[in-house]
A protein has these predicted regions:
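Conserved polymerase palm-domain catalytic core
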Residues: 104, 148-149, 154, 161, ...
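A conserved non-catalytic segment of reverse transcriptases
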Residues: 218, 227, 333-401, 405-407, ...
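Intrinsically disordered, low-complexity and often Lys/Arg-enriched segments
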Residues: 1-33, 266-284, 290
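Core structural elements
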Residues: 46-53, 104-106, 217-222, 299, ...
């Protein structure tokens, strides 16, 4: 397996240290961990260093060049001096007698593989900058309160960590019944009042900040036909702060599921510290043993944004857990669980799908081991994308030449391998994809008279050499 860069969020850390904000973030995290409340966060949010750090961070994102309803992007902010940027942000948030009023959010429908569309809300660039300022201050406060079972849109956490935890549940803990939950239109149906209460309970009690966040949630949406809609629920997908708000909403679910078993008072009260190697860990195994003699249902959650799975030991426990969690989500979070897409999977007999992977367990030497592969739908989608790009190699588009098309094709292949390399059957999946791609390339290159490929030095990147150096195709 190729070496992977484990230095997650290095740029964010370097930028924060450059603007002398990392120490502030660390203090916020520790205060939140100690249970303190925060009633004066706006001064930090509108501090010069935090605003300049926010600009630095969103500038590094390619999406910052996408214009909102005011037709402006990051280059319009970049044309101003640092002092002018700081002054403008402060004026937008606090300068008006009516308070902060974000401009309309541009609605754009993004096609999905199933033929449907995903509504994307693109705020104006100044509003995105303000959201980034807020996110930077709220994130360390929320991180101190978030559950370890949540992996999506969080610093130093990724799909890789979520899948490793999934493998642990199935192979080491033998929790083979998986409940696949689906919340109907989660981002479009977040209850605003519930969200504000959850923020308050996390210690975010600055009324000026709460006012600003309410205005962000209530920002009008400009539809493609030019009409304006005032939202009464939901957070716009595409907003910088939306993933953090989504995690705040579902954090309550994480802790509720954990309280049923993993963090149950019986397990915690019977736990004790042990030294394993050179590390001191809190061992709750004695409490878990006692809980198995009760009517409590063992359940463990793994969540990535609004996509989550709950693992159970038996089918009976899974059925009761599915009913209890569905009822809790609908009553407490005011969200609707899709009965058609929510199901219980016995991974000893069928595949369970999660984050683009399909997973099951198989018997081997009197135990069960994990077997994983790319989801069938994802294989089809990725193959179709590569086939289209292979056709572009044979007949380059007007704005590109053959070499650029090859480089784009290689980057797509690397992207697939980097994401799915955790699958145990990745080589089989890639072999099947490769077979179809080579058929297309062979046919196209033999028939397209205008296409002649030559081996030119210097067209292979260091990453490609490291990954495919021994391949005959290099």
């Amino acid at each position: 397996m190729p070496k992977k860069n484990k230095n997650l969020c290095v740029d964010d850390l370097r930028h924060a240290e450059y603007y002398s904000m990392q120490e502030t973030f660390d203090k916020l995290y520790q205060k939140s961990k100690n249970g303190e409340v925060f009633k004066n966060l706006m001064d930090l949010i509108l501090s010069q260093n935090n605003i300049l750090l926010a600009y630095r961070n969103i500038k590094a994102n390619g999406g910052s060049y996408t214009a909102g309803t005011d037709k402006k992007n990051i280059t319009d902010i970049g044309s101003k001096s640092p002092d002018e940027v700081v002054e403008k942000v402060r004026f937008i948030v606090t300068g008006s007698k009516h308070g902060y009023r974000p401009k309309s959010v541009r609605r754009k429908d993004i096609p999905k593989p199933n033929g449907k569309t995903r509504p994307l809300g693109i705020p104006c660039i100044w509003d995105r900058l303000i959201q980034q300022c807020i996110k930077q201050i709220l994130e360390p406060i929320c991180e101190a309160k978030f559950s370890n079972n949540s992996y999506g849109f969080r610093p130093n956490r990724s799909v890789e960590h979520a899948m490793n935890r999934t493998y642990t549940m199935l192979q080491r803990m033998n929790l083979h019944y998986v409940i696949e939950f689906d919340i109907k239109g989660f981002f479009d149906n977040v209850n605003h009042s519930k969200l504000i209460k959850q923020m308050w309970s996390l210690g975010i009690q600055d009324k000026r900040l709460i006012f600003v966040i309410k205005r962000i949630l209530k920002a009008t949406i400009k539809m493609p036909d030019g009409s304006l809609i005032e939202p009464h629920k939901g957070t716009p997908q595409g907003g910088i702060i939306s993933p953090l708000l989504a995690n705040i909403v579902l954090n309550e679910l994480d802790w509720w599921v954990a309280s049923q078993w993993e963090e149950n008072p019986i397990a915690v009260s019977r736990g004790r510290y042990r030294i394993i190697g050179k590390t001191e860990v809190f061992d709750k195994s004695h409490g878990y043993s006692l809980m198995k003699n009760t009517n409590l249902k063992e359940m463990h959650i793994i969540r990535y944004a609004d996509d989550f799975r709950i693992f159970c030991r038996t089918k009976e426990e899974a059925v009761k857990t599915k009913e209890a969690v569905t009822k809790w989500i609908e009553e407490r979070l005011k969200l609707e669980v899709s009965p058609e897409k929510t199901r219980i999977v016995n991974t000893r007999k069928r595949w369970s799908e999660f984050l683009g992977f399909k997973i099951r367990v198989r018997s081997k030497s009197h135990k069960y081991v994990v077997q994983s592969a790319i989801c069938d739908k994802k294989v089809e989608i990725e193959t179709d994308k590569l086939v289209e790009q292979a056709k572009n190699i044979a007949k380059p588009r007007k704005t590109k030449n053959c070499l650029l098309e090859i480089q784009l094709f290689n980057s797509m292949v690397l992207g697939i391998q980097n994401y799915y390399q955790l699958a145990t059957c990745i080589s089989i999946d890639c072999r099947n994809i490769h077979r179809r791609i080579m058929t297309v390339l062979t046919n196209r290159l033999n028939t397209e008279k205008v296409c002649m490929l030559k081996r030119d030095g210097g067209t292979v990147t260091e990453t490609e050499k490291e990954r495919f150096g021994n391949s005959k195709m290099i």
